[in-house]
Amino acid sequence: MTALLKIGLVSVSDRASAGVYQDQGIPELQAWLEQALVDPFHLETRLIPDEQPVIEQTLKELVDEQGCHLVLTTGGTGPAKRDVTPDATLAVADREMPGFGEQMRQVSLHFVPTAILSRQVGVIRKESLILNLPGQPKAIKETLEGVKDKEGNVLVKGIFSAVPYCLQLINGLYIDTKPEIIESFRPKSARRENLEK
């Protein structure tokens, strides 16, 4: 499929949405996607408070009305009472993709022991993938790219290595990444050169 990739970026923060401080999640995600993706894409961005009904409605709007293939949230994934992003995400899900949350925690544990407090989830709604990411810019990049040594060799794969193939499976969209940022994985039979035969 050659449709333009549509990505929703949702920053969940009471203080940033109230203007107390500048949101850092959406700019970090946008910059990373511009570096990592080969294919052109369109962004829909939302900055919202930590309110479960608002998060649920925003996710539904991005998938159901805006037609986003991929929605990345940032913030609100911890154990505090106001951290309800995973709860809202699960509430709008058709299917859960537990491997994404497991891998995010695995990556983050290489940097901070408090990664076990994270409740990030990955889900499918209709033909879209929704992923909860951490709120801190450094942690966002680490989660997406994985753990690398000083020479840049990947020690633990980041979650985005599985995103292109997941999108291909759920909605037929084929996207590529720049291997120097994140190498996407798909079986040989699902690679473009074999699909075009």
Swiss-Prot record:
Catalytic activity from the UniProt record: molybdopterin + ATP + H(+) = adenylyl-molybdopterin + diphosphate
EC top class named in words? transferase
This protein's UniProt keywords: ATP-binding, Molybdenum cofactor biosynthesis, Nucleotide-binding, Transferase
Which Gene Ontology BP annotations are present? Mo-molybdopterin cofactor biosynthetic process; molybdopterin cofactor biosynthetic process
Record keyword ATP-binding present: yes
User: What's a single GO CC term here?
Assistant: cytosol
The protein's annotated pathway? Cofactor biosynthesis; molybdopterin biosynthesis
**Pfam family of this protein, just one?**
MoCF_biosynth
Keyword Cell wall biogenesis/degradation present in the record's keywords: the answer is: no
Provide the GO MF annotations for this entry: ATP binding; molybdopterin adenylyltransferase activity
UniProt-listed Enzyme Commission number(s): 2.7.7.75
Instruction: Report the domain of life of the source organism.
Output: Bacteria
Q: Which family does it belong to?
A: Belongs to the MoaB/Mog family.
Function, as annotated, reads:
Catalyzes the adenylation of molybdopterin as part of the biosynthesis of the molybdenum-cofactor.
| Record protein name field | Molybdopterin adenylyltransferase
In its UniProt entry, the species of origin is given as: Haemophilus influenzae (strain ATCC 51907 / DSM 11121 / KW20 / Rd)
Gene that encodes it = mog
